[in-house]
Structure formats: structure tokens, C-alpha cells
Amino acid sequence: MIKAAVTKESLYRMNTLMEAFQGFLGLDLGEFTFKVKPGVFLLTDVKSYLIGDKYDDAFNALIDFVLRNDRDAVEGTETDVSIRLGLSPSDMVVKRQDKTFTFTHGDLEFEVHWINL
């Protein structure tokens, strides 16, 4: 699971954050489901693999979603947001195992739980 408070400053750093995800997890493809609330998003699952480099589109979509919602509102209902990331077939060999990480990037802290598919 990845949990992070979302602020205007962190949104502007999202491209760097995207690169940190890729490098830290050693994971370049998959479908990620975010639980999004005002001010908070949770990466709760890695559902599937697919072809195509989608990092920029995926994180732009996440940023757009958060910006469209009132981040400072009283805690609301969670919303699922599927984010698809991918690489070419030659890059699709990924060693998957149960892991838990803690990762800090700027003022964001991530608890990462990788689950076997």
C-alpha cells in the first residue's frame, strides 16, 4: 500500500515522484488502483500487466483527478482510480514476491506492500 498526503507542492513534484516509484519498486508495469479521498490517495493493489508506456498519462490523470476534487474538504467517500503503467514485451520479466517497503520522498511518506499476482 502506498499512502501519501497530497498538497499543491507535492502535485507539482509528481513527475519526480513517478520516477521514484519506478526506481524504488523496480516495477515498470501493471495496473494500480488508487483509493482517493480529499487530501489523501492510497495505492491499494497491482491488478494486471499490459503493454505500452503509460507513466506520464497515468500520473497526469491522477493529478487531474486530485485537482478536480476538494483536497481540503471533510473526509469523503473513497473513489477507485485505475492507473495503467507499462513497458514493451521485452521488458515484461518482473520478479514478484511479497515485500513491504517504507519510502520517503520530500514531505511524502509511502508504505509499499507488493502482493504476488
Curated annotation (Swiss-Prot):
The top of its lineage is: Viruses, Duplodnaviria, Heunggongvirae, Uroviricota, Caudoviricetes
Organism listed in the record: Bacillus phage SP01
Q: Which domain of life is it from?
A: Viruses
| Name of the featured protein | Putative gene 49 protein
